[in-house]
Swiss-Prot record:
Gene3D superfamilies in alphabetical order: K Homology domain, type 1 (3.30.1370.10)
Entry comment, domain topic: The tandem KH domains 3 and 4 are essential for AUACCC binding.
Function: RNA-binding protein that recognizes the sequence AUACCC via its tandem KH domains 3 and 4, probably in order to promote mRNA instability. Plays an essential role in filamentous growth and virulence.
Protein name: K homology domain-containing protein 4
Keywords: Repeat, RNA-binding, Virulence
Effect of deleting the gene: Affects cell growth, pheromone response, filamentation, cell morphology, as well as pathogenicity. Leads to increased levels of mRNAs containing the AUACCC sequence.
Pfam families named in the record: KH_1, KH_Mug60-KHD4
Domain named KH: residues: 412-504, 508-594, 747-816, 817-892, 900-968
SMART domains: KH
Amino acid sequence: MDFYSTSFTIPRSIGASSFVTETTNPNGSITAASSSSFSLEAPRPGSHVGARTAPTASAAPEPPASSLPGRFTSMRSRFPPSVKAFMPSAFGGKRTSDRIVEAVGAEKAEADAATGSSSQPVKAEPEQSAPLAPIGERGNARPSKLVNPSLANMDDNGSSQHRDSRSTVGTRSSFDISSAASFTADSTAASSAIGVNSSSTTHSASNSISANHVQQDRGISLSQSSKDLQEAIQKLSSDIMANHQCLVSFASVPQNDESRMPPTPLSHPFARQSSFSSLQSLDQLPFPNPNGSSGYPYQQYHPQPIGTPDSHSSAFFPGRAAGEALGSGFPGLNSSSLSLSSLNPPASGSHVAQEVGLSSAQPLRSPQPNAIGASRASLSSMPKPPQYNFHLSGGYQQVMNARGTILRENPFKSTSSIKVPRADVFDVAPASSPPAKESIKEDVRRKLDEVQTATGATITLKNSEVRGADLGYGLETERIVEVLVSGTFESVELARVKVLVILDEIAGLRSETCEIDYKLHNIIGGRKRCVVQKIEEETGTSIYLPSSFLGTFGSSLASRNDGKAVAAHQNQIHITGEFFGVQRARDMLFQVSMHKSKGIISRDAAILPRKLDWMLTDRLEELRSIMIDNGTFVAFPLLGSQTSVISVFGDHRVNIERTIRSIMQLACQFYVASLWLLPVGFDVYMPSPQANLNPTQVAPMLKHVANASGAEVVFKSNCFEIHGLESEVRTAVSALLELELIKSFNFEVRFQIELANEHREFISGKKNGKVNKVMKQCGVRIKFETFNDYNFLIDVSGNDRNGVLQGLGLLQEELPAEMSFHVPEAYHKRIIGVGGKNIQRIMKKFGVYVKFSNAEEFAALGGYLDNEDNVIARTPAKNAANLENLKLSVMELVNPKDKDYISETVTISRRYHRTLLGEKAIFIHDIESKTSSSVRFPARESASDLVTIFGPESQIHIAAQMLLDHVPFEAEFRAPNSTELGDAIHSAEFAALAEQLKRDLSISVSPVIEQRRPGGEAVFKLRLNRSNTDFLPTAKDAIEDFLINRNANIYAAPSRTRSDSFASAFPHFANKLISTAGAAESNESFNTAAAAAAAAAEQARVNERRLRAAASTPDIKALFDAPSQHLHGGPGFASSNGGSAATAANSPLITSPLYTSPYGNGRGFGSDVWGAPTRAFTASNASNATPSLMGLPPPSVGTPGAGLVSAAGPGPIGAGVSVPTSGGIQFPSQPSLHQQSGHRLSDEMHMNRGLEGMSMEDRVKALRKPRSFAHRAQSLDIGAMAAQQASQHASGSMSVGPSTPYGLGPIGTGAPGMSGHFPGMTSSQGTFGGGAPHHLYQPPTPQQQAQQQLQYQQQQQQQQQQQQQPGYGMPHQPQHFHASSASISRLPPGRNTQNPDSTTMDEVSRVLAQLAFDRA
């Protein structure tokens, strides 16, 4: 019997599960919990028990930047892994649909990263009796021994990161929009870390509660130690040796062997994938910078660069103790499919974090600003997850059977994470209780126990966040809890669907199941699940299909339940929704299945068994994506069974053929190499003792090479076989040829590459020119072999090590690099040109072959790399950089609205998908038609939040923003529970307030109070559209004011730093239009006491004022404000500011001929804005000087204020009252003696009083007094004051003469009828310049005061006579006196005229402003 030995390392994909070192609680005892229990994790702040300092961090070197343009990274391309390995600079990023993932926000991600980097390691004791629980998963295959872990992700996922666009890689990860979990960019993206926090409450099925009170900040759960892992592997090895009669040895992979082989600048020494770096072109990736301003219309979704320490540093935990061993997952050794983890993009998830097996779903909060850099620097010092190397030897069949058993029954577990609202699963906890003391709702506890019993999975509830994301002003997002499902692959898949159904039931939906053959599920769903989405849209339901891989990894349920459980679960489809919708959806599914089942066809295809095992373990998400994209089902053999046939089921030949082609293309990434050892000289009569190697000598070499490279290394009959990815195979061959034992032999190296048949002519060239050139240049032999109907094999062999590797590299340069994209068929003829001249010129220019597919060809192919792609470009890999240039040239002839069709993903919480697809389907279809795009929702069973939008690049962001407008936004704030609060909430006034908020601000308020226990907190949930988020503080303040007025306690509002804003530049708008504060502070510099008054008012406003002061920040208004005293004369008047006239001259603001300043309306001062520039007027003692004599043109006849005098003082100028002289509307003015007579509008508006005449308390009140909506409107609405003035004219209080029908006298004379309104005004006083200037103002003499009193009495008598006239209206109505004003009508306004509507007011304002400009 030939001796066959193989050595391989598991898990290939690091991070699928974890086993952490043993730790003890503060008492030194080991805590335990029932193995059938699910637990509640709640991070608790406190001292670190048993903490130790992390190893010294070393900074990670920066990779070189890529020279490629940014747009090159967004192309959809299909490059063989060998091509990518040879051209690292040509492959810098992922397609857009894989890059764009939701983050909660850049601020939150930075805060999470800071906490993650600053946290210290804690040793916690695992639960001894609990089942093995995974901690973290990662998706790509690569060895754990990295010289520089910061470069770990550079070569991780060569082929998967730049996979074709069919894949949904990176869309299955264990987090969602509100979570902080890990995101993997690989197709094998595994779920994020799980486990039981050291401070956790664990309950079993019997509802017994046990608490572990170990203090640990990161909240990493330890359910089994590394010692238990080793014991489990030891038991597995013993069972295999007993059952399969072969020798099995295993050893933990050492963590320091990588130092033997130094890394290259761009890759670590033993790359698991091609050696291109996703970090190279990070600065040119075509998505917004998360740290800067985003060009996307939905900026709250900051795209995260994938696989880079900077972008995912929030999930790094550099402080992990060196002794803590983190394992990796396995049933796919990647387990990405097992988890929702790759489905939901995290706010702070990390690809690298999953690679090192860390959980990012931790409470990450830290104030340290340098935490992100520290976390990146400390990445290189982080311990690697444990890997185990298995060495099997014996007969071929026995060894292969043992290998399959190890792949299926390894002790590594899978993890899936679902983010749910905290209120759905937890009771409202009292305010004083710590998070770990929160209790799970009894019905939720019972249902989760039932799921555990039925599936064998372990369910953990974990508080990933103590608080929601801070929205400011005491508001936060909804608090989230993680439901972590861990166990074997099939257990996790089944339990996840059941948990999702339970969550829908908690939300009040009805659920039902229906039985349909599992092979029909994807066929019923259609391409990209279009049929299922249509059913969900019409019925308003959620349809959960089971996993397509049940039974592939070896069923643990089958062994426990006589093999019946898997068959039962494979066929179950869960439907949730409203009762009648569920019934309709069930009937429609049965109807479609009956129709589809009549036309099912299948086809078999052959693939090498090791390639099948690799795809099932490392490319599970790629396979899932292929099936969903094509609407087919692929029956894979049992993992490790050495079966080489797959069966593809579908309802259309095109879909089946495209599925097989895609799988075959995926298999081309896996290489096989062989190293044949030949003796130096062979003598048949005297055989050399060294002709054959002793298997005992080979075993250490196999282990070393397998550990170093990550490939599977086999030795049989003096021949080494290496199986793995291209970079792994290259590394392994180089390592073997360096061994001293091998150098004593002659050898022949052979590389076997698999390629699609359609590329056979492309790679050979004309008359095999390309192949002959490589063979002649490198001295190698290249041979083509037929393999199957879809692929062929290329053998590259030679006896010289350097020649063979060089020949392989040159051949890789000739391998095809493809890129496909979508161009509307209407443009095909225009691009191709007459006789193909246009496209031939482009092809010749860039050396790229292009093919356009019309509708018939497209239907026959089913699309290229993506379902919608109808143009494909192909060129040798050495010319791959020109693919993007060719695409740009082709797209120049396409209209912007139709060019660059791409796929973007928008993160929308999973719970809104059913409503959006059902109730709001009409809006979605409208968005699709307006933007020429299509919206696809993810499969419900994946619990993904990523909604895909496919459309032109110029329109897709508009479509995303329009879609987000229909997504509700939820925020909440809390208040201490009390009897008064309960009474206030249940009162009719609160219902009226809620109705008013909903009507005025479009915000729905839902209070939640726990009535079953004393104390606790009341939660006020505010639900609104994203466009109304500016009104959140207003609604919160209204609710809190309502509670305060009813003696209910509330939490103090957090003090916030002031930020620059332009909000107070628009105080005249009501806050229903623009959310502004009632009164903005003054930006003026008061003199002495005035400055102190302003400072006191500002401090009082910050500390006491409850309404949000959006207008209280420095703004552009400061540029236009008036001098400190705010007393302005009209044109030709000197400024009386209590100082020199230079104050007014230096101010950028001058009096306006348009309208009075709106800023004076709500303060104790007034100011004018936006006036035409005028020259300063020098005061003169001449009493009869006219404006023309002073160097100023005289005002036009009829100009408002032309014949008015200043009321600033007695005599010719002023009567103690400031009369605005700007054009437009004259605000009310009253003599000072009338201020004690009664309430006036001008008093309320503080138009006549400055701050200098007020006490300190009055000044503060004046600054803080909010203005009413009516006064705000008066600030802007000139027509409103015009109507009041018209009323004055109609009442007769302002006389209208025949020569001046509008109450305006000629220039230089007093206006008729004005003497009764302004005491102290005489004909001589009506002239400009008459009397002392403002800055020479003298107090009134006793004679002047007596004269003013007499005139005032005469005025009162005249008013009484007018009020006694019949038809006057309301005789006792208070009269407000306005200065005369021009009217746009030639007739006097009628009496008792109501104010016109707002549109009329706007028109009046516009006309008045135009007239003023015309006259100027």
